[in-house]
């Protein structure tokens, strides 16, 4: 009994939040992108970012582990391989959402290689890529494979893509789908657009669609690398209330989007705002949104948590 109690005390002190949205890049990728892109000097996407750079943030915010999300071009599978190596080597990382071209004939070659690592949790599509895949026979074959394998599709999209989300959900009803950053919501003059409100309700009606309550700073009207985003919970209620009322506590997933969210203010604010919103709803809701939903939805293995 004493041993069990001691174990529980140790466990209680561990970081407890799962952060299923961060970005990391290695030297080779940054050197390549320096020849193809022009980043703001303070943009984290233009810098080498490794797991140890995240450790202080994770410890401070009680983030137990992070699921990394792609930040690379479709035709650079070697950058997926780099991230997967980081996941294997770092106790902070518990999985990866990769980048790929589902219309490509070599998709399955790379997919099988990623799977063999044991750290692949799914793929992310960006904007109009989703519509392209829905209209491509080979991509649809690959989507059916991902559905059978229980993998997740992350979507970096906006409200204008809502119909495509519905089509994906209905055509592949067992596919696990998650909308990133509340459709990249923007609060203008204290509210969100009617188009966004409709998109949230339309997509939430599909039961295999989840939503990340993530990157809260980016919802503000401030420009990146200028003044910090507001810290008052009330400012963010137009977004938070809309997604909570539509998706409910069991289909929302917290995430920081570090370090992009830091372009608009402190990453601490992302957690603080979401926690301030969830706490009055009870500990069960807090636990669901802050870690349980991510663990279940992404099939994160506990043995990979620090």
Where are the regions that the model predicts?
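Alpha-helical scaffolding within the catalytic cores
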Residues: 46-55, 78-82, 106-110, 162-165, ...
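Divalent metal-dependent hydrolysis catalytic cores, especially in the metallo-beta-lactamase
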Residues: 37-74, 93-100, 121-128, 151-153
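Bacterial N-terminal signal peptides
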Residues: 1-8
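Mid-to-C-terminal alpha-helical segments outside catalytic/metal-binding sites
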Residues: 9-20, 29-31, 35-61, 65, ...
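Short, well-ordered coil/turn segments that N-cap beta-strands
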Residues: 14-16, 62-67, 90-95, 117-121, ...
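Conserved, mostly hydrophobic/aromatic
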Residues: 21, 83, 96, 146, ...
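Active-site gating/metal-coordination segments in enzymes
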Residues: 74-160, 167-169, 183-184
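Catalytic pocket-lining loop regions of alpha/beta-barrel enzymes
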Residues: 133-253
